[in-house]
Protein backbone atom coordinates (compact mmCIF):
# COMPACT_ATOMS: atom_id res chain seq x y z
CA UNK A 1 0.00 0.00 0.00
CA UNK A 2 1.28 3.47 -0.84
CA UNK A 3 2.05 6.12 1.82
CA UNK A 4 -0.76 8.26 3.25
CA UNK A 5 -1.28 12.02 3.12
CA UNK A 6 -3.43 14.18 5.42
CA UNK A 7 -6.18 15.96 3.43
CA UNK A 8 -8.18 17.54 6.28
CA UNK A 9 -7.64 18.32 9.93
CA UNK A 10 -9.27 20.40 12.65
CA UNK A 11 -8.45 21.14 16.26
CA UNK A 12 -11.33 20.66 18.70
CA UNK A 13 -10.88 22.27 22.12
CA UNK A 14 -12.79 21.58 25.35
CA UNK A 15 -13.27 23.51 28.56
CA UNK A 16 -12.07 20.57 30.68
CA UNK A 17 -9.65 17.64 30.21
CA UNK A 18 -11.11 14.80 28.11
CA UNK A 19 -10.37 11.13 27.50
CA UNK A 20 -9.12 11.42 23.91
CA UNK A 21 -9.04 7.66 23.32
CA UNK A 22 -12.65 7.25 24.48
CA UNK A 23 -13.75 10.20 22.33
CA UNK A 24 -11.95 8.81 19.29
CA UNK A 25 -13.44 5.34 19.76
CA UNK A 26 -16.90 6.90 20.06
CA UNK A 27 -16.75 8.80 16.76
CA UNK A 28 -15.36 5.73 15.00
CA UNK A 29 -18.31 3.75 16.33
CA UNK A 30 -20.75 6.43 15.10
CA UNK A 31 -19.01 6.55 11.73
CA UNK A 32 -19.45 2.80 11.26
CA UNK A 33 -23.02 2.56 12.56
CA UNK A 34 -24.54 5.67 10.94
CA UNK A 35 -23.19 5.99 7.38
CA UNK A 36 -26.60 7.43 6.46
CA UNK A 37 -25.58 10.57 8.40
CA UNK A 38 -22.61 10.90 6.03
CA UNK A 39 -24.07 9.93 2.66
CA UNK A 40 -27.65 10.07 1.39
CA UNK A 41 -26.89 7.08 -0.82
CA UNK A 42 -26.68 4.80 2.22
CA UNK A 43 -29.62 3.57 4.29
CA UNK A 44 -27.74 1.77 7.06
CA UNK A 45 -24.84 -0.55 7.85
CA UNK A 46 -24.97 -4.15 9.07
CA UNK A 47 -22.02 -5.81 10.88
CA UNK A 48 -20.84 -9.05 9.25
CA UNK A 49 -20.52 -12.02 11.59
CA UNK A 50 -16.90 -13.02 12.13
CA UNK A 51 -15.76 -16.18 10.30
CA UNK A 52 -19.07 -16.40 8.43
CA UNK A 53 -19.09 -17.27 4.72
CA UNK A 54 -19.51 -13.60 3.79
CA UNK A 55 -16.70 -12.60 6.19
CA UNK A 56 -14.28 -15.05 4.57
CA UNK A 57 -15.32 -13.99 1.07
CA UNK A 58 -14.72 -10.31 1.87
CA UNK A 59 -11.32 -11.07 3.44
CA UNK A 60 -10.27 -13.11 0.39
CA UNK A 61 -11.33 -10.26 -1.91
CA UNK A 62 -9.46 -7.79 0.32
CA UNK A 63 -6.21 -9.80 0.15
CA UNK A 64 -6.47 -10.06 -3.62
CA UNK A 65 -7.16 -6.34 -4.11
CA UNK A 66 -4.89 -4.73 -1.52
CA UNK A 67 -2.09 -7.33 -1.35
CA UNK A 68 -1.95 -7.82 2.41
CA UNK A 69 -3.75 -9.87 5.06
CA UNK A 70 -5.71 -7.81 7.64
CA UNK A 71 -6.51 -10.84 9.81
CA UNK A 72 -4.00 -9.94 12.52
CA UNK A 73 -5.02 -6.27 12.68
CA UNK A 74 -6.43 -4.85 15.90
CA UNK A 75 -10.25 -4.69 16.24
CA UNK A 76 -10.93 -5.86 12.71
CA UNK A 77 -14.55 -5.33 11.62
CA UNK A 78 -16.54 -5.67 8.42
CA UNK A 79 -19.78 -3.82 7.70
CA UNK A 80 -22.19 -4.36 4.85
CA UNK A 81 -23.59 -1.08 3.51
CA UNK A 82 -27.22 -1.07 2.37
CA UNK A 83 -27.85 1.60 -0.24
CA UNK A 84 -30.99 3.72 -0.03
CA UNK A 85 -32.11 3.44 -3.64
CA UNK A 86 -31.77 -0.28 -4.26
CA UNK A 87 -33.12 0.08 -7.82
CA UNK A 88 -30.10 2.10 -8.99
CA UNK A 89 -28.16 -0.39 -11.09
CA UNK A 90 -25.02 1.78 -11.20
CA UNK A 91 -24.19 1.08 -7.54
CA UNK A 92 -23.37 -2.18 -5.81
CA UNK A 93 -25.95 -3.99 -3.69
CA UNK A 94 -23.21 -6.21 -2.29
CA UNK A 95 -20.74 -3.70 -0.87
CA UNK A 96 -18.71 -3.64 2.35
CA UNK A 97 -16.14 -1.69 4.35
CA UNK A 98 -13.27 -3.35 6.16
CA UNK A 99 -11.98 -1.36 9.14
CA UNK A 100 -9.20 -1.92 11.67
CA UNK A 101 -7.02 -0.02 14.12
CA UNK A 102 -3.48 0.30 12.78
CA UNK A 103 -2.53 2.35 15.82
CA UNK A 104 -4.37 3.30 19.00
CA UNK A 105 -5.62 6.55 17.42
CA UNK A 106 -5.59 5.55 13.74
CA UNK A 107 -8.25 3.54 11.88
CA UNK A 108 -7.98 2.40 8.25
CA UNK A 109 -11.07 1.89 6.06
CA UNK A 110 -11.07 -0.18 2.84
CA UNK A 111 -14.04 -0.50 0.43
CA UNK A 112 -14.93 -3.89 -1.04
CA UNK A 113 -17.59 -4.88 -3.60
CA UNK A 114 -18.43 -8.48 -4.44
CA UNK A 115 -20.50 -7.87 -7.57
CA UNK A 116 -18.17 -5.69 -9.65
CA UNK A 117 -20.39 -2.61 -9.39
CA UNK A 118 -19.45 0.87 -8.13
CA UNK A 119 -19.21 1.28 -4.36
CA UNK A 120 -21.99 3.70 -3.22
CA UNK A 121 -20.08 5.05 -0.20
CA UNK A 122 -16.35 5.79 -0.72
CA UNK A 123 -14.55 4.04 -3.56
CA UNK A 124 -11.00 4.46 -2.25
CA UNK A 125 -9.33 3.60 1.06
CA UNK A 126 -9.17 6.35 3.67
CA UNK A 127 -8.11 6.77 7.30
CA UNK A 128 -9.37 8.63 10.35
CA UNK A 129 -6.88 9.56 13.04
CA UNK A 130 -6.33 12.01 15.86
CA UNK A 131 -3.49 13.56 17.81
CA UNK A 132 -3.54 14.92 21.36
CA UNK A 133 -1.95 18.41 21.55
CA UNK A 134 -3.12 18.79 25.17
CA UNK A 135 -5.36 17.08 27.71
CA UNK A 136 -8.23 19.39 26.69
CA UNK A 137 -7.92 19.29 22.89
CA UNK A 138 -8.02 16.76 20.04
CA UNK A 139 -6.64 17.22 16.53
CA UNK A 140 -8.87 15.25 14.15
CA UNK A 141 -7.36 14.16 10.81
CA UNK A 142 -8.40 12.51 7.52
CA UNK A 143 -5.85 10.67 5.35
CA UNK A 144 -5.84 9.31 1.80
CA UNK A 145 -3.32 7.20 -0.13
CA UNK A 146 -0.78 9.43 -1.88
CA UNK A 147 -1.31 7.75 -5.26
CA UNK A 148 -5.12 8.30 -5.28
CA UNK A 149 -6.42 11.42 -7.10
CA UNK A 150 -7.63 14.22 -4.83
CA UNK A 151 -10.97 14.56 -6.62
CA UNK A 152 -11.99 11.16 -5.22
CA UNK A 153 -12.03 12.73 -1.76
CA UNK A 154 -13.73 16.07 -2.27
CA UNK A 155 -16.91 15.00 -0.46
CA UNK A 156 -14.96 13.12 2.20
CA UNK A 157 -12.78 16.06 3.21
CA UNK A 158 -15.64 18.60 3.25
CA UNK A 159 -19.14 17.46 4.25
CA UNK A 160 -18.19 14.07 5.69
CA UNK A 161 -15.32 15.51 7.72
CA UNK A 162 -17.61 18.30 8.98
CA UNK A 163 -20.05 15.67 10.33
CA UNK A 164 -17.20 13.90 12.11
CA UNK A 165 -16.09 17.18 13.72
CA UNK A 166 -19.68 17.85 14.82
CA UNK A 167 -19.80 14.47 16.55
CA UNK A 168 -16.46 15.07 18.21
CA UNK A 169 -17.60 18.43 19.59
CA UNK A 170 -20.88 17.11 21.00
CA UNK A 171 -19.86 13.79 22.55
CA UNK A 172 -21.26 13.07 26.00
CA UNK A 173 -19.75 9.82 27.30
CA UNK A 174 -22.12 9.80 30.29
CA UNK A 175 -25.16 9.60 28.01
CA UNK A 176 -26.33 6.22 26.78
CA UNK A 177 -26.92 6.27 23.03
CA UNK A 178 -29.93 4.26 21.90
CA UNK A 179 -29.18 2.39 18.71
CA UNK A 180 -31.77 2.31 15.95
CA UNK A 181 -33.36 -1.11 15.33
CA UNK A 182 -31.08 -2.76 17.86
CA UNK A 183 -33.47 -5.73 18.21
CA UNK A 184 -33.86 -6.52 14.51
CA UNK A 185 -31.97 -7.79 11.51
CA UNK A 186 -31.54 -4.43 9.74
CA UNK A 187 -31.23 -5.93 6.28
CA UNK A 188 -34.45 -7.90 6.72
CA UNK A 189 -36.25 -4.80 8.04
CA UNK A 190 -35.17 -2.71 5.05
CA UNK A 191 -36.44 -5.38 2.66
CA UNK A 192 -39.81 -5.49 4.46
CA UNK A 193 -40.03 -1.69 4.60
CA UNK A 194 -39.29 -1.31 0.89
CA UNK A 195 -42.08 -3.76 0.06
CA UNK A 196 -44.65 -2.07 2.32
CA UNK A 197 -43.67 1.46 1.26
CA UNK A 198 -43.70 0.79 -2.48
CA UNK A 199 -46.59 -1.69 -2.75
CA UNK A 200 -48.90 -0.31 -0.06
CA UNK A 201 -47.71 3.17 0.91
CA UNK A 202 -47.03 4.71 -2.49
CA UNK A 203 -50.61 4.23 -3.81
CA UNK A 204 -51.94 5.81 -0.60
CA UNK A 205 -49.69 8.86 -1.08
CA UNK A 206 -50.92 9.36 -4.63
CA UNK A 207 -54.58 9.26 -3.57
CA UNK A 208 -54.29 11.15 -0.27
CA UNK A 209 -57.00 13.77 0.27
CA UNK A 210 -56.34 14.84 3.88
CA UNK A 211 -54.65 18.13 4.85
CA UNK A 212 -51.67 16.36 6.45
CA UNK A 213 -48.47 15.83 4.47
CA UNK A 214 -48.89 12.33 2.98
CA UNK A 215 -45.21 11.36 2.75
CA UNK A 216 -44.65 11.85 6.47
CA UNK A 217 -47.94 10.40 7.70
CA UNK A 218 -48.01 7.36 5.43
CA UNK A 219 -44.32 6.47 5.36
CA UNK A 220 -44.12 6.78 9.16
CA UNK A 221 -46.86 4.16 9.51
CA UNK A 222 -45.14 2.04 6.84
CA UNK A 223 -42.05 2.06 9.07
CA UNK A 224 -44.05 1.08 12.17
CA UNK A 225 -45.89 -1.71 10.33
CA UNK A 226 -42.55 -3.01 9.00
CA UNK A 227 -41.09 -2.97 12.50
CA UNK A 228 -44.02 -4.92 13.98
CA UNK A 229 -43.77 -7.44 11.13
CA UNK A 230 -40.07 -7.93 11.86
CA UNK A 231 -40.75 -8.36 15.60
CA UNK A 232 -43.03 -11.24 14.64
CA UNK A 233 -40.63 -12.67 12.04
CA UNK A 234 -37.75 -12.66 14.53
CA UNK A 235 -39.84 -14.28 17.27
CA UNK A 236 -39.65 -11.34 19.67
CA UNK A 237 -43.45 -11.21 19.51
CA UNK A 238 -45.69 -14.12 18.47
CA UNK A 239 -48.08 -13.47 15.61
CA UNK A 240 -51.31 -12.24 17.23
CA UNK A 241 -54.71 -13.79 16.68
CA UNK A 242 -56.01 -10.22 16.70
CA UNK A 243 -54.54 -6.85 17.67
CA UNK A 244 -56.31 -3.67 18.70
CA UNK A 245 -54.70 -0.31 17.89
CA UNK A 246 -55.80 1.93 20.78
CA UNK A 247 -56.17 5.57 19.74
CA UNK A 248 -55.70 4.57 16.10
CA UNK A 249 -56.18 8.11 14.70
CA UNK A 250 -56.39 7.98 10.91
CA UNK A 251 -56.33 4.16 10.95
CA UNK A 252 -53.47 3.79 8.46
CA UNK A 253 -51.44 1.48 10.69
CA UNK A 254 -54.42 -0.87 11.06
CA UNK A 255 -54.85 -0.92 7.27
CA UNK A 256 -51.16 -1.68 6.63
CA UNK A 257 -50.98 -4.44 9.24
CA UNK A 258 -54.12 -6.06 7.85
CA UNK A 259 -52.65 -5.91 4.34
CA UNK A 260 -49.51 -7.82 5.39
CA UNK A 261 -51.57 -10.52 7.07
CA UNK A 262 -51.75 -9.34 10.69
CA UNK A 263 -55.44 -9.31 11.71
CA UNK A 264 -56.89 -6.65 13.99
CA UNK A 265 -58.90 -3.46 14.31
CA UNK A 266 -58.54 0.11 15.51
CA UNK A 267 -60.48 2.13 18.04
CA UNK A 268 -60.51 5.87 18.66
CA UNK A 269 -62.72 8.29 20.55
CA UNK A 270 -63.30 10.23 17.33
CA UNK A 271 -63.68 9.06 13.75
CA UNK A 272 -61.74 10.67 10.89
CA UNK A 273 -62.91 11.61 7.40
CA UNK A 274 -60.52 9.12 5.85
CA UNK A 275 -62.35 6.28 7.64
CA UNK A 276 -65.31 6.77 5.30
CA UNK A 277 -63.27 7.20 2.12
CA UNK A 278 -59.86 5.62 1.60
CA UNK A 279 -60.14 3.25 4.59
CA UNK A 280 -63.85 2.42 4.43
CA UNK A 281 -62.99 -1.31 4.21
CA UNK A 282 -60.94 -1.30 7.45
CA UNK A 283 -62.40 -2.25 10.86
CA UNK A 284 -62.15 1.12 12.64
CA UNK A 285 -64.46 1.77 15.57
CA UNK A 286 -65.47 5.09 17.06
CA UNK A 287 -65.59 4.53 20.81
CA UNK A 288 -63.87 5.83 23.95
CA UNK A 289 -61.43 3.42 25.58
CA UNK A 290 -61.86 3.18 29.35
CA UNK A 291 -58.97 1.25 30.93
CA UNK A 292 -60.89 1.13 34.19
CA UNK A 293 -63.34 -1.30 32.56
CA UNK A 294 -60.46 -3.63 31.71
CA UNK A 295 -59.00 -3.27 35.21
CA UNK A 296 -62.38 -4.29 36.64
CA UNK A 297 -62.39 -7.46 34.48
CA UNK A 298 -65.33 -6.35 32.32
CA UNK A 299 -65.36 -7.01 28.54
CA UNK A 300 -64.10 -4.04 26.54
CA UNK A 301 -62.23 -5.46 23.52
CA UNK A 302 -62.92 -8.48 21.32
CA UNK A 303 -62.36 -11.70 23.25
CA UNK A 304 -59.57 -12.96 20.95
CA UNK A 305 -57.40 -9.81 21.20
CA UNK A 306 -53.87 -10.78 22.27
CA UNK A 307 -51.81 -7.72 21.24
CA UNK A 308 -52.40 -4.10 22.24
CA UNK A 309 -50.81 -1.38 20.10
CA UNK A 310 -50.37 2.19 21.28
CA UNK A 311 -49.03 4.52 18.59
CA UNK A 312 -48.99 8.04 20.07
CA UNK A 313 -51.93 7.15 22.30
CA UNK A 314 -51.61 10.24 24.55
CA UNK A 315 -53.33 9.86 27.95
CA UNK A 316 -53.87 6.11 27.39
CA UNK A 317 -50.14 5.45 27.00
CA UNK A 318 -49.34 4.32 30.59
CA UNK A 319 -52.59 2.35 30.73
CA UNK A 320 -51.69 0.12 27.79
CA UNK A 321 -49.24 -2.06 29.81
CA UNK A 322 -51.86 -2.19 32.60
CA UNK A 323 -54.64 -3.25 30.23
CA UNK A 324 -52.31 -5.78 28.58
CA UNK A 325 -51.51 -7.22 32.01
CA UNK A 326 -55.19 -7.60 32.87
CA UNK A 327 -55.81 -9.28 29.50
CA UNK A 328 -52.63 -11.37 29.88
CA UNK A 329 -51.50 -10.30 26.42
CA UNK A 330 -48.51 -8.61 24.77
CA UNK A 331 -48.20 -4.96 23.79
CA UNK A 332 -46.29 -2.63 21.47
CA UNK A 333 -46.08 1.01 22.52
CA UNK A 334 -44.66 4.25 21.10
CA UNK A 335 -44.96 6.83 23.90
CA UNK A 336 -45.54 10.39 22.75
CA UNK A 337 -47.14 13.13 24.86
CA UNK A 338 -46.20 12.62 28.54
CA UNK A 339 -49.16 11.55 30.67
CA UNK A 340 -49.26 9.63 33.92
CA UNK A 341 -52.33 7.62 34.91
CA UNK A 342 -54.50 10.63 35.70
CA UNK A 343 -53.03 13.72 34.07
CA UNK A 344 -49.90 15.36 32.71
CA UNK A 345 -46.68 13.60 33.61
CA UNK A 346 -44.34 15.63 35.82
CA UNK A 347 -40.65 14.79 35.75
CA UNK A 348 -39.48 14.15 39.29
CA UNK A 349 -36.95 11.50 38.20
CA UNK A 350 -37.53 9.35 41.29
CA UNK A 351 -37.66 6.17 39.19
CA UNK A 352 -34.30 6.97 37.55
CA UNK A 353 -32.14 6.84 40.63
CA UNK A 354 -30.29 9.59 42.53
CA UNK A 355 -28.73 12.58 40.76
CA UNK A 356 -29.64 11.50 37.25
CA UNK A 357 -30.64 14.42 35.03
CA UNK A 358 -32.82 13.75 32.02
CA UNK A 359 -35.30 15.41 29.68
CA UNK A 360 -39.04 15.39 30.25
CA UNK A 361 -39.59 12.88 27.44
CA UNK A 362 -36.72 10.61 28.47
CA UNK A 363 -37.98 10.58 32.05
CA UNK A 364 -41.52 9.80 30.86
CA UNK A 365 -40.25 7.00 28.62
CA UNK A 366 -38.23 5.42 31.43
CA UNK A 367 -41.19 5.73 33.80
CA UNK A 368 -43.43 3.92 31.29
CA UNK A 369 -40.76 1.21 30.99
CA UNK A 370 -40.77 0.87 34.78
CA UNK A 371 -44.57 0.40 34.72
CA UNK A 372 -44.14 -2.50 32.28
CA UNK A 373 -41.36 -4.07 34.34
CA UNK A 374 -43.26 -3.79 37.62
CA UNK A 375 -46.16 -5.66 36.04
CA UNK A 376 -43.78 -8.49 35.16
CA UNK A 377 -43.53 -8.15 31.38
CA UNK A 378 -40.43 -9.22 29.51
CA UNK A 379 -39.71 -5.63 28.48
CA UNK A 380 -37.54 -4.51 25.57
CA UNK A 381 -36.83 -1.03 24.23
CA UNK A 382 -35.72 0.15 20.81
CA UNK A 383 -35.48 3.17 18.55
CA UNK A 384 -37.42 3.26 15.29
CA UNK A 385 -36.27 4.68 11.95
CA UNK A 386 -39.35 6.82 11.29
CA UNK A 387 -39.80 10.53 10.45
CA UNK A 388 -40.83 11.52 13.98
CA UNK A 389 -39.12 13.08 17.00
CA UNK A 390 -40.88 10.52 19.23
CA UNK A 391 -39.59 7.20 17.96
CA UNK A 392 -38.66 5.19 21.03
CA UNK A 393 -40.76 2.07 21.49
CA UNK A 394 -41.49 -0.42 24.26
CA UNK A 395 -42.27 -4.08 23.59
CA UNK A 396 -43.91 -6.02 26.41
CA UNK A 397 -44.25 -9.81 26.21
CA UNK A 398 -45.87 -12.06 28.79
CA UNK A 399 -43.06 -14.37 30.02
CA UNK A 400 -43.49 -18.14 30.23
CA UNK A 401 -43.60 -17.97 34.03
CA UNK A 402 -46.38 -15.39 33.84
CA UNK A 403 -46.68 -11.82 35.07
CA UNK A 404 -46.04 -10.66 38.63
CA UNK A 405 -47.89 -12.84 41.18
CA UNK A 406 -49.47 -9.89 42.99
CA UNK A 407 -50.83 -8.25 39.84
CA UNK A 408 -54.00 -6.78 41.37
CA UNK A 409 -52.12 -5.19 44.27
CA UNK A 410 -49.42 -3.85 41.92
CA UNK A 411 -52.01 -2.17 39.68
CA UNK A 412 -53.87 -0.80 42.71
CA UNK A 413 -50.63 0.61 44.12
CA UNK A 414 -49.59 2.21 40.81
CA UNK A 415 -52.97 3.76 40.05
CA UNK A 416 -53.69 4.59 43.71
CA UNK A 417 -57.29 3.46 43.26
CA UNK A 418 -58.23 6.56 41.26
CA UNK A 419 -60.66 6.53 38.35
CA UNK A 420 -59.62 7.23 34.78
CA UNK A 421 -61.47 10.04 33.00
CA UNK A 422 -61.65 9.57 29.23
CA UNK A 423 -61.33 12.58 26.95
CA UNK A 424 -64.62 13.84 25.48
CA UNK A 425 -65.55 12.84 21.94
CA UNK A 426 -65.54 16.47 20.85
CA UNK A 427 -62.61 18.47 22.19
CA UNK A 428 -63.42 22.15 22.51
CA UNK A 429 -60.63 24.17 20.94
CA UNK A 430 -60.42 27.34 23.00
CA UNK A 431 -57.27 29.25 22.01
CA UNK A 432 -59.03 32.60 22.51
CA UNK A 433 -61.61 31.71 19.84
CA UNK A 434 -64.60 31.90 22.18
CA UNK A 435 -64.02 35.41 23.51
CA UNK A 436 -67.09 37.46 22.61
CA UNK A 437 -67.02 39.31 19.28
CA UNK A 438 -67.35 42.66 21.08
CA UNK A 439 -64.33 41.97 23.31
CA UNK A 440 -62.27 40.58 20.44
CA UNK A 441 -62.89 43.64 18.29
CA UNK A 442 -62.20 46.01 21.19
CA UNK A 443 -58.87 44.37 22.08
CA UNK A 444 -57.80 44.03 18.43
CA UNK A 445 -58.53 47.72 17.75
CA UNK A 446 -56.56 48.77 20.83
CA UNK A 447 -53.51 46.72 19.81
CA UNK A 448 -53.85 47.85 16.18
CA UNK A 449 -53.82 51.53 17.20
CA UNK A 450 -50.77 51.04 19.43
CA UNK A 451 -48.73 49.34 16.68
CA UNK A 452 -49.86 51.89 14.05
CA UNK A 453 -48.73 54.81 16.23
CA UNK A 454 -45.44 53.15 17.22
CA UNK A 455 -43.71 54.48 14.07
CA UNK A 456 -44.21 57.06 11.31
CA UNK A 457 -42.93 54.62 8.66
CA UNK A 458 -44.82 55.05 5.35
CA UNK A 459 -44.45 52.71 2.35
CA UNK A 460 -45.99 53.80 -0.95
CA UNK A 461 -48.43 56.08 0.84
CA UNK A 462 -49.53 53.49 3.41
CA UNK A 463 -48.67 53.87 7.11
CA UNK A 464 -47.08 50.61 8.27
CA UNK A 465 -46.69 51.37 11.96
CA UNK A 466 -43.87 49.92 14.02
CA UNK A 467 -42.48 46.55 15.04
CA UNK A 468 -43.38 46.20 18.71
CA UNK A 469 -41.98 43.62 21.18
CA UNK A 470 -44.72 41.38 22.54
CA UNK A 471 -43.71 42.26 26.10
CA UNK A 472 -44.36 45.94 25.36
CA UNK A 473 -47.63 45.16 23.60
CA UNK A 474 -48.80 43.10 26.58
CA UNK A 475 -48.60 46.28 28.64
CA UNK A 476 -51.63 47.59 26.72
CA UNK A 477 -53.83 44.79 28.08
CA UNK A 478 -55.90 45.30 31.20
CA UNK A 479 -56.17 42.61 33.86
CA UNK A 480 -59.64 41.82 32.52
CA UNK A 481 -58.25 41.40 29.00
CA UNK A 482 -55.60 38.98 30.26
CA UNK A 483 -58.18 37.02 32.21
CA UNK A 484 -60.36 36.67 29.11
CA UNK A 485 -57.42 35.15 27.24
CA UNK A 486 -56.31 32.94 30.12
CA UNK A 487 -59.83 31.55 30.53
CA UNK A 488 -59.66 30.51 26.88
CA UNK A 489 -56.33 28.65 27.32
CA UNK A 490 -54.47 31.33 25.39
CA UNK A 491 -52.41 34.47 25.69
CA UNK A 492 -51.42 37.54 23.72
CA UNK A 493 -49.50 35.67 21.02
CA UNK A 494 -52.39 33.27 20.46
CA UNK A 495 -54.79 36.21 20.20
CA UNK A 496 -52.58 37.97 17.65
CA UNK A 497 -52.14 34.85 15.52
CA UNK A 498 -55.89 34.30 15.51
CA UNK A 499 -56.19 37.79 13.99
CA UNK A 500 -53.67 37.12 11.24
CA UNK A 501 -55.49 39.47 8.86
CA UNK A 502 -54.38 42.34 11.11
CA UNK A 503 -51.14 41.24 12.79
CA UNK A 504 -47.95 39.49 11.81
CA UNK A 505 -46.04 37.86 14.70
CA UNK A 506 -42.37 37.10 14.22
CA UNK A 507 -39.60 36.36 16.75
CA UNK A 508 -41.36 37.84 19.81
CA UNK A 509 -42.46 40.98 17.96
CA UNK A 510 -45.68 42.07 16.25
CA UNK A 511 -46.36 44.41 13.34
CA UNK A 512 -49.30 45.17 11.08
CA UNK A 513 -49.96 42.70 8.30
CA UNK A 514 -49.06 44.08 4.88
CA UNK A 515 -50.45 41.77 2.22
CA UNK A 516 -48.26 43.42 -0.39
CA UNK A 517 -45.63 41.16 1.18
CA UNK A 518 -47.57 37.85 1.30
CA UNK A 519 -46.57 35.14 3.75
CA UNK A 520 -47.56 31.59 2.76
CA UNK A 521 -47.91 29.11 5.62
CA UNK A 522 -46.25 25.69 5.48
CA UNK A 523 -49.69 24.07 5.34
CA UNK A 524 -50.60 26.15 2.29
CA UNK A 525 -47.30 25.25 0.64
CA UNK A 526 -48.03 21.53 1.00
CA UNK A 527 -51.71 21.83 0.13
CA UNK A 528 -52.59 23.99 -2.91
CA UNK A 529 -56.31 23.45 -2.27
CA UNK A 530 -55.87 25.10 1.13
CA UNK A 531 -54.10 28.04 -0.54
CA UNK A 532 -56.93 28.41 -3.06
CA UNK A 533 -59.55 28.29 -0.29
CA UNK A 534 -57.82 31.01 1.73
CA UNK A 535 -57.79 33.30 -1.31
CA UNK A 536 -61.58 33.34 -1.51
CA UNK A 537 -63.19 36.38 0.15
CA UNK A 538 -65.06 35.38 3.30
CA UNK A 539 -64.50 38.17 5.82
CA UNK A 540 -64.63 41.97 5.59
CA UNK A 541 -61.25 43.60 5.07
CA UNK A 542 -60.06 44.98 8.43
CA UNK A 543 -57.68 47.47 6.86
CA UNK A 544 -60.38 48.84 4.56
CA UNK A 545 -62.65 49.48 7.55
CA UNK A 546 -60.12 50.56 10.20
CA UNK A 547 -56.81 51.73 8.73
CA UNK A 548 -56.68 55.51 8.10
CA UNK A 549 -55.18 54.85 4.64
CA UNK A 550 -57.51 51.97 3.84
CA UNK A 551 -56.42 48.66 2.34
CA UNK A 552 -52.92 48.71 0.76
CA UNK A 553 -54.07 46.33 -2.00
CA UNK A 554 -57.44 47.71 -2.99
CA UNK A 555 -60.60 45.69 -3.72
CA UNK A 556 -59.24 44.17 -6.96
CA UNK A 557 -56.29 42.39 -5.32
CA UNK A 558 -57.40 41.93 -1.70
CA UNK A 559 -58.50 38.46 -0.63
CA UNK A 560 -61.06 39.95 1.80
CA UNK A 561 -64.44 41.58 1.15
CA UNK A 562 -64.59 45.32 0.42
Swiss-Prot record:
- Compartment annotation: Cytoplasm
Gene Ontology MF terms in the entry: tRNA (uridine) methyltransferase activity; tRNA(Ser) (uridine(44)-2'-O-)-methyltransferase activity; zinc ion binding
Catalytic activity line of the entry: uridine(44) in tRNA(Ser) + S-adenosyl-L-methionine = 2'-O-methyluridine(44) in tRNA(Ser) + S-adenosyl-L-homocysteine + H(+)
E.C. no: 2.1.1.211
List keywords of the entry alphabetically. Answer: Cytoplasm, Metal-binding, Methyltransferase, S-adenosyl-L-methionine, Transferase, tRNA processing, Zinc, Zinc-finger
PROSITE patterns assigned to the protein according to its UniProt record, in alphabetical order: ZF_C3H1
Name the family the entry cites: Belongs to the TRM44 family.
The free-text function statement in the UniProt record for this protein reads: Probable adenosyl-L-methionine (AdoMet)-dependent tRNA (uracil-O(2)-)-methyltransferase.
Q: What is this protein called?
A: Probable tRNA (uracil-O(2)-)-methyltransferase
Amino acid sequence: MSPWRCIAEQLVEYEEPVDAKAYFDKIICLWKEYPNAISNRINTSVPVEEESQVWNEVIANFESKYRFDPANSSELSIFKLIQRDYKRQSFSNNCYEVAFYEEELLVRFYPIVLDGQQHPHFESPYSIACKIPSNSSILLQFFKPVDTPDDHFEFLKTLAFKQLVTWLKSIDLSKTTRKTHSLLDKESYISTYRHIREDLGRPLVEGWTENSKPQKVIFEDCGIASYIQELITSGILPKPRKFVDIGCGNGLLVHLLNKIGIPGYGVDVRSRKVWKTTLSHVDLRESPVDPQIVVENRPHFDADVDLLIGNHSDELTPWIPVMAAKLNCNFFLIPCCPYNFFGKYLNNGSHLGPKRMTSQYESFFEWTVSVSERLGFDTKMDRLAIPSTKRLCIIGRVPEKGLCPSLEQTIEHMTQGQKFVARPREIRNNNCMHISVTDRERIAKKLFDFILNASDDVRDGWRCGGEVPLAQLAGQLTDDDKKLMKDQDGGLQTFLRNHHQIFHVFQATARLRDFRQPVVSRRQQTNPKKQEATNRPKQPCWMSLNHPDGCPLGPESCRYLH
